[in-house]
Design a protein with these regions (language model features):
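General beta-strand structural signal in soluble alpha/beta enzymes
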Residues: 12, 65-68, 91-92, 123-126, ...
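Portal/gating segments that form or line small-molecule/metal binding sites
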Residues: 37-38, 43-99, 103
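C-terminal and late-domain segments of enzyme folds
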Residues: 1-33, 43-60, 137-139, 143-233
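Class I SAM-dependent methyltransferase SAM-binding "motif I" and its flanking Rossmann-like core
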Residues: 92-170
Length: 233
């Protein structure tokens, strides 16, 4: 007998995954009071990052959780799988994507996140928390200059967060795609985001009227930036 697989869902933002985005994620779970987990790995498990998460969740009918990576077996009784796979949604924090990826892979979190995605647990985040789901993208995770980073590869192609907020993002992203050094992909302004079902764009959203998303590709040797007009959430 054939078993129907759950729809895989990812909700990203270019920067700023606040109450409106969390509310939308909660709706995507289909649960009346969803369990939402925050992974502040990219922000080095800073207390301030977790505090902001709880503040953003406070107006919503959700059960908010945080899972740090800097833990010890003497203080954490539950395994990573018991925590992550018991959730309805998982949000990755902003911060250092390169370090985030290294820690997740060392701890086997990358494998569990794919299992969560396959089970229909909604994944998401902004900045490092949006970049992490793609094949690759632009990052400020290294000293001196913007560079590139390889990520989980759940969504094929590349990603640039903070497209309107950091002056170097747009020219570097277009240069890398134009030269063929980076795959075509999606760029998001701060306060704008994309909801993917499976790996296809289902809805483009924003919490600020001027914020937009883009699909950037190379056509006949030239870079083409196509605007994806969002709707307010």
């Amino acid at each position: 007998m054939r078993t129907e697989r759950a729809t895989r869902k990812i909700l990203i933002a270019g920067g700023g995954f606040g109450t409106a985005f969390i509310r939308y994620m909660a709706q995507l779970t289909g649960k009346p009071r969803p369990r939402l987990l925050y992974l502040p790995t990219a922000s080095a498990d800073r207390d301030a990052s977790a505090l902001n998460w709880f503040k953003a969740c406070a107006p919503l009918n959700v059960e908010a959780h945080v899972q740090n990576m800097f833990i010890a077996s003497t203080s954490q009784a539950l395994g990573w799988d018991e925590v992550l796979l018991s959730m309805d949604g998982i949000v990755a924090s902003g911060g250092n994507t390169l370090n985030q990826q290294a820690i997740w892979k060392a701890q086997g979190i990358d494998v569990l996140l794919r299992q969560a995605w396959d089970r229909g647990i909604v994944l998401g985040g902004a900045s490092a928390g949006s970049l992490c789901w793609f094949d690759e993208g632009t990052t400020d995770s290294r000293p001196k200059v913007l560079s590139t980073v390889q990520c989980l590869g759940f969504i094929p192609g590349s990603h640039s967060p903070h497209y309107d907020a950091e002056p170097g993002r747009r020219p570097l992203y277009q240069k890398l795609i134009g030269s063929g050094e980076m795959k075509p992909g999606y760029a998001c302004d701060n306060d704008a985001g994309i909801y993917f079902e499976e790996t296809a764009v289902k809805r483009v959203v924003h919490t600020r009227p001027a914020a937009k998303c883009y699909y950037v590709s190379r056509v006949d040797g030239k870079v083409v930036e196509r605007t994806l007009e969002p709707e307010a959430i």
